[in-house]
Amino acid sequence: MEQLAVLKKLSALSNTPGIGAISAKKLADQYGGINALFDFDNKKAAGLQHDKVENLRQAIGHTYRSQDNHLRAQKEQAFMAAKGVDLTHYGQENYPELLRECPDAPMGLMMRGSWPKNQIFIGVVGTRKPSKYGVEFCRELIKELAPL
């Protein structure tokens, strides 16, 4: 899937009121993946719908089609190109298997390099705007884990 299209979908999921990581993952699973969730003409999905789910899906569609969402996705794409960052998302083969099992795992991950295969590793998933507490906690956690 084209990177900009994926970024638009991930942006819509993270910027639609009422949609968090857990509900985004549930919706993607229910509809058969991120692409199917955004296939608004999908007749097969009609049997899965009930009012609350369909209202959320329509809200996601509204956010997805907005100019603001498109601009956010373009900005992310430019950032990724400038920093040499790749993107993977929930449902892709290279999305970390153990992270997939977390109920509130992020729908998208930006990364440099490749994921180690068949190794135990620790990753810190964060935000670009962490709180002071979050920064300090992470710093202390990494300091404790580094010698291991």
Model region roles, listed by residue range:
Residues 1-143:
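Short, positively charged patches
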Residues 144-148:
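A short, Lys/Arg-enriched amphipathic alpha-helix followed by its capping loop at the start of a domain
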